């Protein structure tokens, strides 16, 4: 079907008023505006939306209409006010208007699917109907008398009815259908969608032209009986059928008698259309130029201008559509990308702020923890250093005290005065002398020496002596000495460890003394003691200051080496008498040496002792006496502790350490 916008633009070009006719056409324009207001919001039959773009070139019909306008100058005369009754039998004849071949602007009927009648296809040489007084009233419902169709080439009768102004009677009356034979005699083949425009009143181009109106019976006979002579426009239409067919893809369809039914019976409700310029009767009489004249800006609506601009736009092809779609997609994707980028940038900024704060807080906490750990470690290290320093100081002090004690073992820490110490030393010396006397007496008696049984069974010995013998094992078997040798031992051949001291078991000094066969020596004896003075003596004078590990000898060690008859328990005559019956007569004779009394007559005195750098010398000479001379017992200095016989230094036979003690020197 043909687009309606082109016909509407053609109608606008035909009926465009001039600026000088503005005052004369003012009432008509006002009535047109009033009509438009009544029909606002509805599209009339055949009207299209002006905002829809139309992509096509001008059709051949429009070109033909343009040529027809150039060939014929249509002059519209205003109709007379006294119009005969439209329903009269004989319409008054009208002189033929010079616009016989002028194209009639297309009515909105072009949208109807029916094939236009031959009378509608040819340009009707009808002069515009004179406006009746009712024409000024918009949408008049009274029927308008048809204008007489005089001087038509096809001997047209007056117009049966005005399609643009339906009357009330005809609108209420049922529409009369035209017989199919009315359009059959026309042999012209034209597209059903291309009706030729007919010159009509300005209201013919208005939307009211599409309203269906039943044709009057008076108007039909001239159309049916009188053959219409071919007009120049019809000839041109017949001459250019290929152009019509090429412009319209639809094939021609034979007219059917039912084609007019939709147009007559069912008028399409349409939205209001912008007011189109309507020419008044005086404007119809103005001569028309042969060429289409561009409408003035004041008379052409913006919609018409817009439609004129886009009418000749070519239809977009597939590459153009693809390019347009690509551009649209690119713009949309760019917009979405920018939007997402902005959102992402804000999110990243927010995350940076939050993470920066959290990282800062974590760093602060970590630094605090590290500072606390370092502080604790430093405190622990300082305490360890202090402990090590204190320990080193303690060890140093202990070593210093140990060194001082080791170098100053002869320190006397007693609170006694010098006189008291001297008196005690004198008493100890006297005790030692008494012990020597008792030992000499014991050595003169060999009863207990040759017979161990007599020693154990001797009831004259005190009880502690037997207990000590039972507690101390024998170091070596007691050698039996023959009579000719006359070898006398100073002490019993038993080790005498101290039960109260540990070091006394390790340090035993044996007295290696061999007496002559004649008599035991009771002369001066030399005792070699270790360099360290030994604090011994009777329990009566012991002060208990020596330690067990420092002093290997105790006062109790003298118990193991005590003679059977100490000085304070000298055997009486009765005791000797008791011992003599139990002894051997031979030993009894041999056990009493001749020189016993003589030996005891030379006891050592205090003035015979002298201090010799850690040793005691109890003789005028430091060498042994010969066998014939009064010998002495010598305790050599160079012998070790364990190589000096069986005699213990701490025994009663040993010398007191306080004998001849030097004055104390602290820093020696």
Curated annotation (Swiss-Prot):
<feature type="compositionally biased region" description="Low complexity">
    <location>
        <begin position="97"/>
        <end position="120"/>
    </location>
</feature>
<keyword id="KW-1003">Cell membrane</keyword>
<dbReference type="GO" id="GO:0005856">
    <property type="term" value="C:cytoskeleton"/>
</dbReference>
<dbReference type="InterPro" id="IPR025064">
    <property type="entry name" value="DUF4005"/>
</dbReference>
<feature type="domain" description="IQ 1">
    <location>
        <begin position="321"/>
        <end position="350"/>
    </location>
</feature>
<comment type="function">
    <text>May be involved in cooperative interactions with calmodulins or calmodulin-like proteins. Recruits calmodulin proteins to microtubules, thus being a potential scaffold in cellular signaling and trafficking. Regulates cell and organ shapes (prevents twisting) in aerial parts probably by regulating transverse microtubules (MT) arrays alignment. Regulates the formation of oval xylem secondary cell-wall deposition pits through microtubule-dependent lateral inhibition of Rho GTPase domains, thus confining the area of active ROP domains within the lattice of the cortical microtubules.</text>
</comment>
<comment type="similarity">
    <text>Belongs to the IQD family.</text>
</comment>
<feature type="domain" description="IQ 2">
    <location>
        <begin position="343"/>
        <end position="372"/>
    </location>
</feature>
<feature type="compositionally biased region" description="Basic and acidic residues">
    <location>
        <begin position="415"/>
        <end position="431"/>
    </location>
</feature>
<feature type="region of interest" description="Calmodulin-binding">
    <location>
        <begin position="1"/>
        <end position="11"/>
    </location>
</feature>
<keyword id="KW-0206">Cytoskeleton</keyword>
<feature type="compositionally biased region" description="Basic and acidic residues">
    <location>
        <begin position="18"/>
        <end position="31"/>
    </location>
</feature>
<dbReference type="GO" id="GO:0010089">
    <property type="term" value="P:xylem development"/>
</dbReference>
<comment type="subunit">
    <text>Binds to multiple calmodulin (CaM) in the presence of Ca(2+) and CaM-like proteins.</text>
</comment>
<dbReference type="GO" id="GO:0005737">
    <property type="term" value="C:cytoplasm"/>
</dbReference>
<feature type="region of interest" description="Disordered">
    <location>
        <begin position="399"/>
        <end position="431"/>
    </location>
</feature>
<dbReference type="Pfam" id="PF00612">
    <property type="entry name" value="IQ"/>
</dbReference>
<dbReference type="GO" id="GO:2000652">
    <property type="term" value="P:regulation of secondary cell wall biogenesis"/>
</dbReference>
<feature type="compositionally biased region" description="Pro residues">
    <location>
        <begin position="269"/>
        <end position="279"/>
    </location>
</feature>
<keyword id="KW-0112">Calmodulin-binding</keyword>
<feature type="region of interest" description="Disordered">
    <location>
        <begin position="66"/>
        <end position="305"/>
    </location>
</feature>
<dbReference type="GO" id="GO:0005516">
    <property type="term" value="F:calmodulin binding"/>
</dbReference>
<keyword id="KW-0472">Membrane</keyword>
<dbReference type="Pfam" id="PF13178">
    <property type="entry name" value="DUF4005"/>
</dbReference>
<feature type="compositionally biased region" description="Basic residues">
    <location>
        <begin position="32"/>
        <end position="43"/>
    </location>
</feature>
<dbReference type="InterPro" id="IPR000048">
    <property type="entry name" value="IQ_motif_EF-hand-BS"/>
</dbReference>
<feature type="region of interest" description="Disordered">
    <location>
        <begin position="16"/>
        <end position="54"/>
    </location>
</feature>
<feature type="region of interest" description="Disordered">
    <location>
        <begin position="476"/>
        <end position="561"/>
    </location>
</feature>
<feature type="compositionally biased region" description="Polar residues">
    <location>
        <begin position="516"/>
        <end position="529"/>
    </location>
</feature>
<protein>
    <recommendedName>
        <fullName>Protein IQ-DOMAIN 14</fullName>
    </recommendedName>
</protein>
<feature type="compositionally biased region" description="Low complexity">
    <location>
        <begin position="166"/>
        <end position="175"/>
    </location>
</feature>
<dbReference type="GO" id="GO:0005886">
    <property type="term" value="C:plasma membrane"/>
</dbReference>
<keyword id="KW-0677">Repeat</keyword>
<feature type="compositionally biased region" description="Pro residues">
    <location>
        <begin position="78"/>
        <end position="96"/>
    </location>
</feature>
<dbReference type="GO" id="GO:0009834">
    <property type="term" value="P:plant-type secondary cell wall biogenesis"/>
</dbReference>
<keyword id="KW-0963">Cytoplasm</keyword>
């Amino acid at each position: 079907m043909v687009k309606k916008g082109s016909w509407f633009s053609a109608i606008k070009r035909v009926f465009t008023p001039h600026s000088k006719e503005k005052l004369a056409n003012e009432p008509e324009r006002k009535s047109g505006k009033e009509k438009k207001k009544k029909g606002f919001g509805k599209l009339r039959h055949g009207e299209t939306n002006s905002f829809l773009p139309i992509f096509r070139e001008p059709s051949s019909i429009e070109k033909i209409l343009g040529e027809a306008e150039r060939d014929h100058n249509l002059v519209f005369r205003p109709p007379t006010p006294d119009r005969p009754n439209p329903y009269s039998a004989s319409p008054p004849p009208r002189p033929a208007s010079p616009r016989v071949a002028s194209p009639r602007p297309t009515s909105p009927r072009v949208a109807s699917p029916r094939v236009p009648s031959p009378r509608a296809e040819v340009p009707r040489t009808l002069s515009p109907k004179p406006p009746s007084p009712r024409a000024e009233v918009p949408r008049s419902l009274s029927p308008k008398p048809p204008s007489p169709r005089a001087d038509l080439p096809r001997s047209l009768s007056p117009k049966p009815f005005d399609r643009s102004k339906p009357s009330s009677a005809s609108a209420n009356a049922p529409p009369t259908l035209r017989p199919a034979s009315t359009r059959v005699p026309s042999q012209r083949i034209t597209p059903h969608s291309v009706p030729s425009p007919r010159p009509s009143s300005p209201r013919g181009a208005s939307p009211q032209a599409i309203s269906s109106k039943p044709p009057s019976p008076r108007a039909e006979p001239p159309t049916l009986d009188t053959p219409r002579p071919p007009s120049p426009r019809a000839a041109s239409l017949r001459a250019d059928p290929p152009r019509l067919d090429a412009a319209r893809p639809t094939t021609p369809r034979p007219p059917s008698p039912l084609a007019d039914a939709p147009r007559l019976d069912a008028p399409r409700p349409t939205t209001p259309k912008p007011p189109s310029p309507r020419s008044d009767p005086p404007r119809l009489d103005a001569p028309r130029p042969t060429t289409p004249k561009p409408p003035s800006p004041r008379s052409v609506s913006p919609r018409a201008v817009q439609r004129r601009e886009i009418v000749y736009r070519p239809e977009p092809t597939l590459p153009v559509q693809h390019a347009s779609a690509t551009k649209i997609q690119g713009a949309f994707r760019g917009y979405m990308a920018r939007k997402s980028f902005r959102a992402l940038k804000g999110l990243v900024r927010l995350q940076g702020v939050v993470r920066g704060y959290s990282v800062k807080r974590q760093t602060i906490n970590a630094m605090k923890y590290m500072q606390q750990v370092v502080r604790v470690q430093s405190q622990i290290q300082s305490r360890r250093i202090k402990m090590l320093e204190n320990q080193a100081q303690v060890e140093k002090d202990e070593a210093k005290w140990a060194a001082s004690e080791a170098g100053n073992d002869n320190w006397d820490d007693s609170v006694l005065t010098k006189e008291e110490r001297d008196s005690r030393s004198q008493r100890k010396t006297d005790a030692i002398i008494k012990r020597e006397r008792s030992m000499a007496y014991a050595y003169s008696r060999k009863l207990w020496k040759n017979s161990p049984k007599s020693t154990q069974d001797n009831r004259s010995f005190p009880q502690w002596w037997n207990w000590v013998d039972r507690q101390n094992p024998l170091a070596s078997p007691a050698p039996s000495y023959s009579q000719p040798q006359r070898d006398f031992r100073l002490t019993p051949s038993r080790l005498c460890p101290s039960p109260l001291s540990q070091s006394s078991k390790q340090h035993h000094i044996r007295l290696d003394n061999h007496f002559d066969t004649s008599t035991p020596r009771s002369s001066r004896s030399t005792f070699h003691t270790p360099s360290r003075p030994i604090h011994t003596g009777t329990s009566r004078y012991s002060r208990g200051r020596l330690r067990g590990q420092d002093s290997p000898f105790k006062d109790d060690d003298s118990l193991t080496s005590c003679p059977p008859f100490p000085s304070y328990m000298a055997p009486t005559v009765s005791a000797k008498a008791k011992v003599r019956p139990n002894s051997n007569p031979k030993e009894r004779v041999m056990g009493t040496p001749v020189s016993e009394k003589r030996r005891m007559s030379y006891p050592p005195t205090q003035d015979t002792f002298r201090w010799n750098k850690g040793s005691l010398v109890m003789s005028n000479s430091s060498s042994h006496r010969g066998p014939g001379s009064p010998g002495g017992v010598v305790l050599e200095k160079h012998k070790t502790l364990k190589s000096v016989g069986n005699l213990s230094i701490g025994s009663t036979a040993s010398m007191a350490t306080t004998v001849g003690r030097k004055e104390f020197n602290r820093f020696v």
